[in-house]
Amino acid sequence: MDRERVLHQCVQLYALQPERLSKQVRIEQALRQAIIQQWPGGLRLPSHRALAEAFGVARQTLALAMATLQEERLLTTGHGQGTWTCKPSAPAHEPPLPPRLSRRAQRVLQGPGASMIQSGAFVPGIPDIAQFPMRKWRQLYASVTVPQNALLLSYSTGGYGPLKRAIREFLARWRNIHCDTEQIIITDGTHNGIELCAVALADVGDTVAMESPCYWGARNVFTAAGLNIEMLPWRPEAGHALPATPGPVALAYLTGSHHYPLSVPTSAEHKQRLCEALSPTYVVEDDYEFNRDDHPNLLFDAHSERHLLVGSFSKMMFPGLRLGYLVVPRHLAGPMNRLRSELFREGRMLDQAVLAQFIFDGDLDAWCRRIQRDYLGRQQVLHDQLCSLPQVRSVSPPSSAISLCVEFAPGVNDVAIAQALLKEHLIVRPLSPVCAASDPRVGLVMGVGMLSGETLAREAQRLRRCLEPLLRQGH
């Protein structure tokens, strides 16, 4: 690969990064994407001077970005000899033994999972990190990290008390949920909360009922827990497809007020009808995305003995936070708190203290109101570009959520389309891999968290231009 082509690809990928990010981070993401997706191992890069000129940055900025990629072992350098993309390790004289993984692990790894690419145009599930009030967050962090707060460096038992009280009040304001503080369990995010439910409330071989299409992360957690998964297609206009002869169901896992990945409002009536048909021992509702007015779509009842609610702050704030909560029936609060302590151990009290103060100060409410208005406008821009494309059956109505879903006509190969778009640096998820075998729906799931303003308008137009010929071909 010649020098000019490498420089051209660098500049092209750099231009696709969100302009709100620092120049160093944009360079890191551009080079990381090129190394992972496009360049072979052992490719010698142009000189630092040439790269800095191509990016239009100071050499020190480039050097910092390159140092980060060296730490990630994506680049290697020799003193005075240049910089190369890292070559694959040389094969050993004896072929390595294949990894001996459990059947559960193999099933998880064979299905859809977390993407290796967590930034870029339309990447699903990532909130707007650049606009988050990180300055206020850092100030709060500094204010709680003082010698008299040394206990915040220790283990926690069931979570930081003030954070549980803050969450209780937040749920009352935003979700019309009135629960006791003792019913709240602090978790390390949605996956951790779902895993705790799976371990505490079901045995290996028990059945969990899920909606189709489903959230891939929850399906992987249940698979890893050794549960039998029964996926039931759900359509907004018709409800759930009920099994003719339902067997015993330990858990019914349902999305909360806003369906993921379809990105449409759910129906408490549909969920109630499903639960009446299946009679699950417990109902776990995942309040993945929501706004202040859609709480009537929740089935959750804080006074019920079989309803649990899973929530997370990662989608509201930033993914690296990894803090969430469970609201559980009163009789389960003690046992599940103890089980969490035994299985996962608890800590991160500093993060919990900062989040509690962030909520008490009204900053989380203000952030949610602001960013949800913004997401609604962004979704409208994307919706307008997609709704008139050939082979498009429907586009989820603009909402204040991060995600948007476009459904294609039957027969369109959404997996191939997603792969083709990836080559154009457009990061989307195909819908069909998270549908049941009996659910023929195909489409794409995309996000609006990483793009805004003119960049969003430009990339939405580019997405349309790339999609149109692919859909005409049926790909």
What do the PLM-derived regions correspond to, one by one?
Residues 281, 307, 392, 426:
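Short, conserved active-site loop motifs that form the nucleotide-linked donor/cofactor pocket
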Residues 150-280, 290-303, 375, 471-475:
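Conserved core of the PLP fold type I
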Residues 330-335, 364-365, 411:
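Short helix-loop capping/hinge motifs at secondary-structure junctions, enriched
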